């Protein structure tokens, strides 16, 4: 199941999962994604289902219960350009909803995608390569929220056994990218 699967990065993941023979459930509210981004995935002819849902909705939790995916990809989180506090503040309830659905329905792993700059702050060339666990020297609401999201993932792993992976992306570009 790919939340944010009609977005730039999510739609590429959907194609890869289909190419690998997986059936894929895409959940997207289309607030920033587009059905056009799934055109190539639909043409592949695999098992693809689209659900126009917000991850904070009861319908989303019910869908997770019905489909019971092993892995839940949550790519509907903080975009690198997230600067307005309202969109940043929405990330926590979105992730909590995904984690609760995962906990209640036996999902084994959650994978999230967060811009590396929000996790690590600005890194100067002399500090490369960045080591995992490096303290975030960035100050601002988006950076604090990114760390909060990672902390929530850790809590759910410790308390509920839900494994997680954080993809810390940098300078992602390509087809279907918004201008």
Task: Locate each region found by the language model.
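ATP-dependent carboxylate-amine ligase catalytic core
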Residues: 179
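N-terminal Rossmann-like NAD(P)+-binding domain of SDR-like oxidoreductases, especially those catalyzing
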Residues: 1-175
């Amino acid at each position: 199941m790919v939340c944010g699967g009609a977005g730039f990065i999510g739609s590429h993941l959907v194609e890869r999962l289909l190419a690998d023979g997986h059936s894929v459930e895409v959940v997207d509210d289309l607030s920033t994604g587009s059905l056009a981004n799934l055109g190539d995935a639909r043409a592949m002819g695999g098992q693809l289902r689209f659900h126009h849902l917000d991850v904070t909705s009861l319908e989303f939790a019910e869908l997770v219960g019905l489909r019971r995916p092993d892995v839940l990809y949550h790519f509907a989180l903080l975009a690198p350009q997230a600067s307005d506090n309202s969109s940043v503040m929405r990330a926590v309830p979105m992730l909590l909803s995904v984690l609760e659905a995962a906990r209640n329905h036996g999902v084994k792993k959650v994978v999230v995608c967060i811009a590396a700059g929000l996790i690590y702050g600005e890194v100067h060339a002399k500090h490369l390569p960045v080591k995992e666990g490096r303290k975030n020297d960035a100050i601002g609401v988006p950076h604090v929220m990114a760390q909060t999201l990672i902390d929530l993932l850790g809590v759910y792993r410790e308390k509920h056994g839900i494994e997680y992976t954080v993809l810390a992306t940098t300078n992602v570009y390509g087809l279907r990218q918004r201008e």
